[in-house]
C-alpha cells in the first residue's frame, strides 16, 4: 500500500494510464480484425480501405508507446500480404 502522497498519486496515475493503454490496444486489435474479416469475406475494396485505416491506427499506437514498433511492422506486413494475395487470387 502506498504510504506517501507521492506514492498514492503514482498509483492513481498508473491505473489511469493502464486503462488508457488498454483502450488503445483494444482499438488496435479491432482494426486488425476488421481487415481480417474483409479478407475472409473476399471483399477486396473493403479490405484495402480497412488496411489503410488499420495501418494508421497501428502507427498511432506505436507513436504513443503502447505497441512495439517491431510488432507493428510485422502486423502491417502480414496484413498487406493477405490483402495483396486477395488481389492476385482474383486475377
From Swiss-Prot:
The reply to whether Transcription regulation figures as a keyword in the UniProt entry is: no
> Which is one Pfam family of this protein?
Ribosomal_S20p
User: Mind telling me which Gene3D superfamilies this protein's record contains?
Assistant: Ribosomal protein S20 (1.20.58.110)
Identify the keywords attached in UniProt to this record, alphabetized. Ribonucleoprotein, Ribosomal protein, RNA-binding, rRNA-binding
Please list the GO biological process terms of this entry: translation
The record's annotation in InterPro entries points to:
Ribosomal_bS20, Ribosomal_bS20_sf
Task: Give the GO molecular function terms.
Answer: small ribosomal subunit rRNA binding; structural constituent of ribosome
Q: Name one GO cellular component term.
A: small ribosomal subunit
Assigned protein family: Belongs to the bacterial ribosomal protein bS20 family.
**Which PANTHER family does the annotation name?**
30S RIBOSOMAL PROTEIN S20 (PTHR33398), SMALL RIBOSOMAL SUBUNIT PROTEIN BS20C (PTHR33398:SF1)
User: What role does this protein play?
Assistant: Binds directly to 16S ribosomal RNA.
Protein name (Swiss-Prot/TrEMBL): Small ribosomal subunit protein bS20
Q: Which organism is it from?
A: Acidithiobacillus ferrooxidans (strain ATCC 23270 / DSM 14882 / CIP 104768 / NCIMB 8455) (Ferrobacillus ferrooxidans (strain ATCC 23270))
Amino acid at each position: 500500500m502506498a504510504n506517501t502522497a507521492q506514492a498514492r498519486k503514482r498509483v492513481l496515475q498508473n491505473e489511469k494510464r493502464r486503462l488508457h493503454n488498454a483502450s488503445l490496444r483494444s482499438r488496435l486489435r479491432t482494426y486488425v480484425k476488421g481487415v481480417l474479416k474483409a479478407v475472409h469475406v473476399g471483399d477486396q475494396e473493403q479490405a484495402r480501405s480497412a488496411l489503410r485505416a488499420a495501418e494508421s491506427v497501428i502507427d498511432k499506437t506505436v507513436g504513443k508507446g503502447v505497441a512495439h514498433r517491431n510488432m507493428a511492422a510485422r502486423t502491417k506486413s502480414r496484413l498487406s500480404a493477405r490483402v495483396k494475395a486477395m488481389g492476385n487470387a482474383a486475377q
